[in-house]
């Protein structure tokens, strides 16, 4: 398992296409997340193995022969702040648990309930970094919170969002409608969205 550290999650996403090109057909996983998920896992009291420097990370796994050579090519192409090769299976499993546990915690940690509705938004990987920057800006512009993460090698992002739904108040759905419309309009510029075949949360 190769862990790559970047200043931000969007910059981690920017590196995805270079990794895919450096090891074509060899990456069996290329997952992205940032320090918000790591902080949630730590706050729960779960151990977090050492991560490379940065606030955004890619977790990459390579399959096939000549794995050391493929890893060297990935590191050379990554333009990362810092890298860490994890050979110990137990430690690699603990790192994957951060992604798995954090994904669940991300939807339950906000001050108000979080909902699906903008799940599995996908763009071509070469546009993912730009889309993540736009997505975070759209959240802020609509007064919403969410913790994105996802399958960066596929250009696919998950995020549960604290839409301000209020029972019996149809007007409370207005923010949801406005946000979804704004996201769909912006995402069209990036030739999204369709979840890649076989992608799951």
Model-based region annotation:
Residues 1-198:
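Noncatalytic alpha-helical scaffold of FAD-dependent oxidoreductases
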């Amino acid at each position: 398992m190769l862990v790559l550290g970047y200043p931000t999650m969007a910059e981690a996403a920017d590196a995805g296409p270079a990794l895919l090109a450096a090891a074509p057909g060899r990456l069996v996983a290329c997952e992205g997340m940032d320090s918000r998920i790591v902080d949630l896992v730590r706050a729960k009291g779960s151990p977090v193995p050492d991560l490379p420097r940065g606030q955004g990370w890619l977790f990459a796994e390579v399959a096939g022969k000549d794995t050391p050579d493929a890893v060297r090519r990935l590191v050379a192409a990554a333009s990362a702040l810092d890298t860490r090769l994890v050979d110990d299976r137990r430690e690699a499993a603990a790192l994957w648990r951060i992604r798995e546990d954090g994904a669940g915690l991300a939807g339950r940690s906000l001050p108000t309930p979080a909902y699906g509705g903008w799940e599995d938004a996908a763009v071509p990987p070469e546009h993912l970094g730009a889309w993540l920057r736009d997505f975070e800006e759209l959240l802020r512009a609509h007064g919403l919170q969410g913790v994105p993460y996802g399958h960066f090698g596929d250009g696919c992002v998950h995020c549960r969002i604290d839409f301000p739904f209020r029972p019996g108040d149809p007007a409370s759905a207005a923010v949801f409608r406005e946000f979804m419309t704004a996201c769909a309009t912006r995402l069209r510029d990036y030739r999204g969205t369709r979840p890649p075949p076989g992608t799951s949360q």
